[in-house]
């Protein structure tokens, strides 16, 4: 099993190319089930979750071809992937596939919309709290679907003639459920109005792609989205937006290690809140012609309190990385997690490196220390795993991160990108 070895102490200087967003690519790929034409996606990252979803879509009858190019040694792959689903050959998404990745559950929306039925296993993915599927079920029921849970599967069927547009208010904001409702409502009869919809850039990206396919959608990026159903969707060509979580992660890595790095192919508007928070911590961030420049030279890291919130608030997917940064701040900071109820699993691993963190419910208190010391640590989920890498960049000696398959789910060749900027990071196999 692979591990990541980090030898701390080096600053980061250079250019890091930002990949396409995993959290945008997955729903875009699933949208290929909505049309019998070809959907072409550019800037698709090469990640374990993407490859798993390719297998799942193939199970449903999607023909997939990949074109990749590598412009120079070490540069991230820029992949163009073509998805063609002439006929859906199977409306069942089996446990052995869906259990490995939560987002694969989202196929339930397009399958219902196009075929009128779906049998989908309850999902897997990161072990972050309960993450129930109630919001998905209730949203699709509002469109007329009949839903039944049986033996770990959801059996869903649309009314005769297809799903029916409706006005629905989510009881809480959910990115995944908003994705599913967008896709399902695009082929529903009549008009659907979604209130309390997620406003994340990935939702907007999906809406833009669906519109290019012929959907009629207004309001994406606001809390109210209106979808006028159409009888069919066509193919389209769409570029996956830059990964804002990867952008924020590398910005925090530079903040931790110090240095001067250009994050290429991204933009500040995707994560204004997180970047403003880093500025408060003492990091200089500016726009460039190709992306963002992140600089921290000499000045110490200032403590900053954060509360995770849906977009445009501070992203929960950057909480662990920011906690790692705060372990070296010149004071005490507090992090309140409001999105997931069990997203502090990285705390005990950061403590193994010398971090001083105490928990009280959904709040963490971080007392900055002057030094961290390398140790063997274990990744518990995707974002927690990269927080350990960030901490390892400044820890004295060697930090060995195990269970890095979590990293491979969401970060495209992380060790290579960091190494190109001067970090001592390598993947080792037992």
From Swiss-Prot:
Places the protein is found: Cytoplasm
Highest taxon listed in the record's lineage: Bacteria
Enzymatic class: transferase
EC nos: 2.5.1.7
Residues binding UDP-N-acetyl-alpha-D-glucosamine: 102, 131-135, 172-175, 317, 339
Pathway listed: Cell wall biogenesis; peptidoglycan biosynthesis
Main location: cytoplasm
Segments crossing the lipid bilayer: none
Catalytically driven reaction(s): phosphoenolpyruvate + UDP-N-acetyl-alpha-D-glucosamine = UDP-N-acetyl-3-O-(1-carboxyvinyl)-alpha-D-glucosamine + phosphate
Binding site for phosphoenolpyruvate: 22-23
Active site: 126
GO biological process, one term: peptidoglycan biosynthetic process
2-(S-cysteinyl)pyruvic acid O-phosphothioketal modifications at: 126
SUPFAM superfamilies referenced in this protein's UniProt entry, alphabetically: EPT/RTPC-like
UniProt keywords, alphabetically: Cell cycle, Cell division, Cell shape, Cell wall biogenesis/degradation, Cytoplasm, Peptidoglycan synthesis, Pyruvate, Transferase
GO molecular function: UDP-N-acetylglucosamine 1-carboxyvinyltransferase activity
InterPro entries referenced in this protein's UniProt entry, alphabetically: Enolpyruvate_Tfrase_dom, Enolpyruvate_Tfrase_sf, MurA_subfamily, RNA3'P_cycl/enolpyr_Trfase_a/b, UDP_GlcNAc_COvinyl_MurA
Functional description taken from the UniProt entry: Cell wall formation. Adds enolpyruvyl to UDP-N-acetylglucosamine.
Family of the protein in this entry: Belongs to the EPSP synthase family. MurA subfamily.
Protein name: UDP-N-acetylglucosamine 1-carboxyvinyltransferase
Species of origin: Agrobacterium fabrum (strain C58 / ATCC 33970)
Classification of source organism: Bacteria, Pseudomonadati, Pseudomonadota, Alphaproteobacteria, Hyphomicrobiales
